[in-house]
């Protein structure tokens, strides 16, 4: 019962955050997008895909997912095959079988040999696709598991660079006048190390 109520609250938060983004220009849901969940089952700690839910709930709006979790958004990618108003753009270090489809594009930045310049180029590419597609809303999965101290992280991705990534995403959304909602995403460090990284995302959103 507690799990059920928690899941329903999270998903209600996704829908409310989308509405607030259209009203205010920017919003957040203090929860994850659960991007590994597919249509008929949960997957990898993800119950129901809240990113796809937004597209399903608002069929007249084009929902563009900018997924910056270290693991590719494989579940969201699968949803793009039958939800026409959903586009998935995943920038990741670990593939997690994230497929490429007509409306699912991936950018792999190697956790050892990659660098932040490659990463920022991928972010710019994501916004170019959002413009070309005519997105009505960007949902930003602000993953923290790419941090260099995370067990899944990229060795070059420092705390300062994560903050720079967040600032870049918010600045580009504002520049191109995209309503944007963001959700928290992966992070497997100890809580006292992880929470400040998530807090930085909120600071970047208000900078």
Task: Identify the role of each PLM range.
Residues 179-184:
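Short acidic/histidine-rich active-site segments
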Residues 1-7:
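Active-site neighborhoods of divalent-metal-dependent phosphate/nucleic-acid chemistry enzymes
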Residues 15, 19, 28-175, 199-203:
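Conserved alpha-helical scaffold segments that buttress catalytic/binding sites
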Residues 112, 185-186:
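A general structural signal for short secondary-structure boundary/capping elements
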């Amino acid at each position: 019962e507690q799990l059920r109520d928690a899941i329903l609250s999270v998903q209600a938060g996704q829908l409310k955050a989308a509405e607030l983004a259209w009203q205010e220009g920017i919003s957040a849901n203090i929860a994850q997008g659960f991007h590994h969940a597919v249509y008929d089952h949960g997957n990898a700690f993800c119950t129901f895909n809240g990113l796809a839910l937004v597209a399903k709930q608002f069929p007249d709006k084009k929902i563009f997912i900018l997924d910056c979790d270290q693991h590719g958004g494989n579940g969201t990618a699968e949803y793009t095959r039958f939800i026409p108003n959903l586009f998935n753009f995943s920038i990741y270090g670990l593939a997690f079988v994230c497929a490429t489809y007509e409306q699912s594009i991936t950018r792999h930045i190697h956790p050892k040999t990659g660098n932040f310049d490659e990463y920022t180029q991928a972010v710019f590419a994501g916004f170019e696709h959002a413009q070309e597609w005519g997105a009505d809303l960007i949902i930003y999965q602000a993953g923290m598991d790419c941090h260099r101290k995370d067990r899944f992280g990229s060795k070059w991705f420092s705390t300062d660079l994560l903050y720079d990534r967040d600032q870049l995403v918010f600045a580009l959304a504002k520049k191109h006048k995209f309503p944007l909602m963001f959700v928290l995403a992966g992070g497997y460090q100890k809580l006292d190390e992880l929470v400040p990284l998530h807090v930085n995302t909120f600071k970047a959103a208000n900078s």
